[in-house]
Swiss-Prot record:
Pfam families according to UniProt: DNA_mis_repair (PF01119), HATPase_c_3 (PF13589), MutL_C (PF08676)
Name used for this protein in its record: DNA mismatch repair protein MutL
Purpose: This protein is involved in the repair of mismatches in DNA. It is required for dam-dependent methyl-directed DNA mismatch repair. May act as a 'molecular matchmaker', a protein that promotes the formation of a stable complex between two or more DNA-binding proteins in an ATP-dependent manner without itself being part of a final effector complex.
Transmembrane segments: none
Polar residues biased stretches: 396-430
Entry's Gene Ontology BP terms: mismatch repair
Organism annotation: Agathobacter rectalis (strain ATCC 33656 / DSM 3377 / JCM 17463 / KCTC 5835 / VPI 0990) (Eubacterium rectale)
Top-level lineage group: Bacteria
Family from the record: Belongs to the DNA mismatch repair MutL/HexB family.
Gene name for this UniProt entry: mutL
Length: 648
């Protein structure tokens, strides 16, 4: 048996450093957090070659007293806490006392520091945990750390670092997170002698978001401000149009610390679920202050936390974010194509160029128009449809949209559903430029006229149906386009989910019943999830052996192959390894609603589309179908006139 021996201090330090210093980004994080704890108002981060060869952190904080400099590099030496009880209430970013010891064990470190009260500063040099110099030096107030040749004495660790460009991008991302966490501190980031980021430190969180993420995101934000018995949260979330395919744009800060939290992420993603496409994630910059005790001593990076009351925090945060999203009208606006027109190439010809045929034809048309008699009123006669449909005032049953496929005349008139205000004649073709945000979701203020309201519906002007799928509606100075399939799918989905929540799902008997033969796995899933299946409105009875009989089906889902849908449901339950049952139910309701909804190319009548709009009005979130596609988009009068070059 090998002898058991105590490791020497150098080996211990290198092993400990491996937990704290994973890459150059870790060095920057630890040193900048120390600078923040020192009360700095300006911090400069400079790196070269991705921070592998050179890192310099400069701050104007309180500095380190001369007799404390060497002690600061001992393991577990800190000014942040004094006992284990302090871990639950610690407010500083650092507290373990391991950072300087770990960094100096695997790099060449130079420290220059001066306190406000001292006349001169201190220069301290340490390499591989060995002190090389400790001397007085002239220096400004604050602290400067210079870290060179990271992992110079641990070649195995250095070998596994990525390229300088990749390591530099990690540092850039970390500096951005630190700048977001403390908008009252001016951050400057220099990479290979080029300034990549410089914030003002004016405390304005939206300014920081603009500096880091740009105008598109900063102009599409919703403010969050909420306080409850568990926490206080402030900051911004992105409108549903701002999404990413990963969680890189989810930023959470707790008591000034950038953290990654599954509880917070899941709560916010649940709130966004009905507003986003599948596998898309929102943009968030949220600042939390928790009133209960927190455990930040979970991971050496201090980026993970534990809460006392996970469930309460989850529910409160999810409800808060959903309320903000649900009470804003966010209809995607079609952007104007900003691609500049190609420049015309002008050729010189010595002989006169013959007048193009197209120009002559246009001139002839204009001449013919000028000879027209405008005094006579021309009325278009519309042939009434011979197909019988429900009258406008006739109440529609819930399944009207599904059971009636009414063919109407090809020439659909413009129908006004209320007392629409006729537009005033234009007195001039000159238009004042308006401020337009293109490619975003327009959030209307409290005093703007909202599209999906009862009062607004009285002023709708339904123009007609386009491609037998989209309904065109004029309101105020915008054209709204409703996707009849997505809208009906959303209505069915919300009705089904409401019935599930209230446990009042009703069924309709079918004759003859559907008889199916299930295999062993399907039988197991049926018995395991029978309560959930019966909640949908199915009535399933054992018919002997592997035979099962469906005698009743959900009463609000029509025109669906119920046998295939039932088998598909059992397959989904079978494939849902490790997933929450409510998530499976939600997805299945969305699938059922999609299949039962009116399809594209289905001709709807005016009463039917009015019924559909009325049902949309009753929803908290009528803007997206269950899969995240928009139900309504809009195009402003300004944008249409821009397309026709009436506005240049």
């Amino acid at each position: 048996m090998p002898n058991i021996a105590i490791l020497n201090q150098e080996t211990i330090d290198k092993i400990a450093a491996g937990e704290v210093v994973e890459r150059p980004c870790s060095v920057v994080k630890e040193l900048v957090e120390n600078a923040i704890d020192a009360g700095s108002t300006a911090i400069t981060v400079e790196i070269k070659e991705g921070g592998i060869s050179f890192i310099r952190i400069t701050d104007n904080g309180c500095g380190i007293e001369r007799d404390q400099v060497a002690v600061a590099f001992y393991r577990h030496s800190t000014s942040k806490i004094r006992s284990a009880e302090d871990l639950l209430t610690v407010k500083s970013l650092g507290f373990r006392g391991e950072a300087l010891s770990s960094i100096s064990a695997v790099a060449r470190v130079e420290l220059i520091t001066k306190t406000y009260d001292e006349l001169t500063g201190t220069r301290y040099v340490i390499e591989g945990s060995k002190e090389l110099s400790n001397e007085e030096i002239g220096a400004p107030d604050g602290t400067t750390f210079i870290v060179k040749d990271l992992f110079y004495n641990v070649p195995a660790r250095r070998k596994f670092l990525k390229t300088a460009q990749t390591e530099g991008s990690y540092i850039s991302d970390m500096v951005e997170k630190l700048a977001l966490s403390h908008p009252d501190i001016s951050f400057k980031f220099i990479n290979n002698n080029q300034t990549k980021l410089h914030t003002s430190g004016n405390g304005n969180r939206k300014d920081i978001i603009y500096h880091i993420f740009g105008r598109e995101i900063s102009s599409s934000l919703l403010e969050v401000k909420h306080e409850c018995e568990y926490f206080k949260v402030e900051g911004f979330i992105g409108k549903p149009v701002i999404t990413r395919g990963n969680r890189n744009y989810e930023n959470y800060f707790i008591n000034g610390r950038y953290v990654k939290s599954n509880i917070l992420s899941r709560a916010i993603e649940e709130a966004y679920k009905s507003f986003l496409m599948q596998h898309q994630y929102p943009f968030t910059v949220l600042y939390f202050t928790f009133f209960s005790e927190l455990d930040v001593n979970v991971h050496p990076t201090k980026m993970e936390l534990r809460f006392d009351n996970n469930n309460e925090i989850y529910v409160e945060l999810c409800d808060t974010i959903y309320a903000i999203l649900a009470h804003k009208e966010m209809i995607p606006e079609v952007p104007v194509d900003s691609t500049p027109a190609p420049k015309k190439i002008v050729h010189e010809y010595k002989e006169p160029i013959p007048e193009p045929f197209e120009k002559r034809r246009i001139n002839e048309v204009r001449a013919a128009e000028s000879r027209s008699v405008y005094g006579q009123s021309v009325t278009a006669t519309v042939k009434s449809s011979t197909v019988k449909g429900p009258a406008v005032n006739e109440p529609l049953t819930e399944n009207t949209l599904n059971q009636q496929k009414v063919k109407t005349s090809a020439s659909t008139p413009v129908v006004h559903t209320g007392n629409s205000v006729e537009p005033k004649p234009e007195t001039s073709t000159a238009y004042e430029p308006a401020h337009v945000v293109t490619g975003t979701q327009q959030t209307l203020g409290d005093y703007d006229k909202v599209f999906l309201t009862e009062s607004a519906k009285k002023q709708f002007s339904i123009i007609g149906q386009l491609f037998k799928t989209y309904w065109l509606i004029e309101f105020e100075d915008k054209l709204y386009i409703i996707d009849q399939h997505a809208a009906h799918e959303k209505v069915l989905y919300e009705k089904t989910m409401a019935r599930l929540a209230n446990k009042d799902f009703t069924s309709q008997r079918i004759s003859p019943p559907i008889v199916m033969t299930l295999d062993a796995r399907e039988c197991e899933m049926l018995e395991k999830y029978r309560p959930q299946i019966e909640q949908f409105g199915y009535e399933v009875e054992h018919f002997g052996g592997k035979e099962y009989m469906i005698s009743a089906i959900p009463d609000n889902l029509f025109n669906i192959d119920m046998k295939d849908l039932f088998i598909e449901m059992l397959d989904d339950f079978s494939n849902a390894t490790g997933r929450q049952t409510p998530d499976i139910i939600t997805e299945k309701v969305a699938s059922m609603s999609c299949k039962a909804a009116v399809k594209g190319n289905d001709k709807l009548t005016l009463p039917e589309i009015n019924k559909l709009i009325d049902e949309l009005l009753s929803l908290d979130n009528p803007y997206n179908c269950p899969h995240g596609r928009p139900t309504i988009i809009s195009m402003s009068k300004y944008e249409i006139e821009k397309k026709f070059k009436r506005i240049v």
